C-alpha cells in the first residue's frame, strides 16, 4: 500500500505520535494535496493484479464518501465506484424527480449500496444492493441499465431468441427515454439516508424535486446491521429513582456526555444545559468543541412537546436593529426569503439559539460551500456567485427583505422589539395555523394513539 503525495510538500510525514493536522475527509479543493491511497487488487476481468486508487473526500452539501477507481494494465479493464463513509442516518430518504427536459438528465446523483431506483413509466426497478454505490447522473443510471441488459445479448439471441427480442425492445424504450419526448419520474429510495439528487436551482426550491424522510422498519434496520437490544435482558446500569434528579436541579447543572466530532470524528465532549427562554418555554442547549480540529457546534432542542398548532413568523429586515432580534429556531423549522426565492428546509440547519443576523450568516456560509463551486458548468457557478453577491447586499442592509420562519411543531420563537402589548411590533407578524395531514405525517403524529391505546386496534 502506498500514498500518493506532493513531493514538493514541506509538511513532515505523519507519525504515530503526531496529531493529524487535518480531517481525513476534506472537501475537494485544487489548492490542497489529495491523499490518494493505492492498493493492489485482483482484476475481475482477467484475474491479474491491478491497482485500486482510494480518495476519501467530502461532498459539499452532502456527506463523506470514498471514491474508488480501479485500473488493470494487463487487459485495460476500468471500474469506478463510490462507498459511503458517513454514519447511517436516523431516517431513510425518499427522493422523487420529475424529468421534463434533456437538461434534467445531467443532474448529479449520489447513491449508496442501500438505495433502490425505479422509473414507473417503463416499469424499471433497480433493487437495493443490486449495484455498487456511485456518483453519476440521471442519464448515467439509464446508460448503466442499458449496458447491463446488453451483456450476453449475442449468446442470448442463439440460445433464447424470444427472450433476447424482448430485452432488445426494452433497451429501445430506454434509448427513447433519454430523448425525453414525454416527462417521466425517477424515484430514489435509500434506507440508510445517504443518497442525493442535485437541485440545479439551489438555493431556490425545485418544483420538480421532492424529498421526504421515513422511519425504517425493523427488517430494514437489520438489513443495515442495526439490531435492537433485548430490553428484557439484565442491564448493567442501575435504575434511577423517580425523585433522584428533580427538574429544578437540572436548570443550574451543565451535563456532559461523550460524542464524536462531526468534522473529524475524533472523541470529544458535548455540554448540555436546560434553560428557560423568557416569554417562551424550556429548551435544551447543547455545545460541542473538538480539541483535535477546533470545530465548534451548538444546537437547541425543545424541552417540551409538539404544540397544538404550528407557528409562522414574518420578520421584515430593514435596519441594524432588526438583525439583533433573538431567534430560537427548532430543528423542525423551515426558513424562506420570498424576495430572493430562497427556501431552506428544516434539516438544512439544526436547531439553534441565535439572532436574525446569525441565521443569515449560517445560511450564507452553507450556500458558500455548496456543490456548485467545484462544478465544471460556468453558468451554474456564475448563477451561484450572483446569488451570493445579492445575499451580501442583504447582510449590508442594501435590500429590504422578509424572513419567514415556519415551524409546524410550534417550537420556534422570534423576539419582539416591543415590550408593550398596546404598541405591537410592526415588523414582526406571528401567525398560528392548523397543521395539514402532511405536516402531522412528517412529525409522526398520524400514527400516534393518545386515547384508548390500551384497547386493541
Swiss-Prot record:
Residues 1-21, 414-457 are annotated as: Disordered. Residues 425-438, 448-457 have a biased composition (Basic and acidic residues). It holds the Pfam family jr-ZPR1. InterPro entries: Znf_ZPR1 (IPR004457), ZPR1 (IPR040141), ZPR1_A/B_dom (IPR042451), ZPR1_jr_dom (IPR056180), ZPR1_Znf1/2 (IPR042452). Belongs to the ZPR1 family. Might mediate EGFR and FGFR signal transduction cascades required for lumen formation in tracheal cells. This is Zinc finger protein ZPR1.
Amino acid at each position: 500500500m502506498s500514498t500518493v503525495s506532493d513531493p514538493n510538500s514541506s509538511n513532515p510525514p505523519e507519525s504515530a505520535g503526531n496529531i493529524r493536522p487535518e480531517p481525513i475527509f476534506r472537501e475537494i479543493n485544487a489548492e490542497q494535496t489529495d491523499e490518494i491511497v493505492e492498493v493492489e487488487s485482483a482484476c475481475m476481468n482477467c484475474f491479474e493484479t491491478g491497482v485500486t486508487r482510494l480518495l476519501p473526500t467530502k461532498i459539499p452539501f452532502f456527506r463523506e464518501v470514498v471514491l474508488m477507481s480501479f485500473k488493470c494494465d494487463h487487459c485495460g479493464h476500468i471500474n469506478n465506484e463510490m462507498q459511503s463513509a458517513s454514519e447511517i442516518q436516523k431516517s431513510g430518504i425518499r427522493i422523487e424527480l420529475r424529468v421534463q427536459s434533456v437538461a434534467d438528465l445531467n443532474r448529479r446523483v449520489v447513491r449508496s449500496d442501500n438505495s433502490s431506483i425505479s422509473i414507473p413509466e417503463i416499469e424499471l426497478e433497480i433493487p437495493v444492493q443490486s449495484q455498487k454505490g456511485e456518483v453519476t447522473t440521471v442519464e448515467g443510471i439509464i446508460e448503466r441499465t442499458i449496458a447491463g441488459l446488453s451483456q450476453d445479448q449475442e449468446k442470448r439471441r442463439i440460445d433464447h431468441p424470444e427472450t433476447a427480442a424482448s430485452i432488445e425492445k426494452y433497451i429501445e424504450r430506454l434509448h427513447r427515454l433519454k430523448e425525453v419526448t414525454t416527462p417521466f419520474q425517477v424515484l430514489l429510495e435509500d434506507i440508510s439516508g445517504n443518497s442525493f439528487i442535485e437541485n440545479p436551482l439551489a438555493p431556490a426550491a425545485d418544483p420538480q424535486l421532492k424529498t421526504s424522510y421515513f422511519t425504517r422498519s425493523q427488517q430494514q434496520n437489520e438489513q443495515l446491521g442495526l439490531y435492537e437490544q433485548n430490553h428484557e435482558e439484565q442491564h448493567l446500569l442501575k435504575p434511577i429513582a423517580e425523585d433522584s434528579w428533580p427538574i429544578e436541579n437540572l436548570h443550574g447543572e451543565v451535563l456532559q456526555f461523550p460524542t464524536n466530532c462531526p468534522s473529524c470524528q475524533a472523541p470529544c465532549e458535548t455540554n448540555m444545559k436546560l434553560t428557560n427562554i423568557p416569554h417562551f418555554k424550556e429548551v435544551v442547549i447543547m455545545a460541542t468543541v473538538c480539541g483535535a480540529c477546533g470545530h465548534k457546534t451548538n444546537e437547541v432542542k425543545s424541552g417540551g412537546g409538539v404544540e397544538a398548532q404550528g407557528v409562522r413568523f414574518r420578520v421584515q429586515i430593514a435596519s441594524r436593529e432588526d438583525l439583533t432580534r433573538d431567534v430560537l429556531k427548532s430543528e423542525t423549522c423551515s426558513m424562506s426569503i420570498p424576495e430572493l426565492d430562497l427556501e431552506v428546509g428544516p434539516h438544512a440547519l439544526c436547531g439553534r439559539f441565535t439572532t436574525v443576523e446569525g441565521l443569515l450568516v449560517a445560511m450564507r456560509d452553507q450556500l458558500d460551500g455548496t456543490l456548485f463551486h467545484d462544478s465544471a458548468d460556468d453558468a451554474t457557478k456564475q448563477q451561484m456567485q450572483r446569488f451570493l453577491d445579492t445575499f451580501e447586499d442583504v447582510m449590508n442592509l442594501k435590500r429590504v427583505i422578509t424572513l419567514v420562519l415556519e415551524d409546524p411543531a410550534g417550537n420556534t420563537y422570534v423576539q419582539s422589539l416591543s415590550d408593550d402589548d398596546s404598541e405591537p411590533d410592526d415588523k414582526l407578524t406571528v401567525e398560528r395555523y392548523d397543521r395539514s395531514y402532511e405536516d402531522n405525517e412528517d412529525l409522526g403524529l398520524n400514527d400516534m394513539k393518545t386515547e384508548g391505546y390500551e384497547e386493541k386496534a
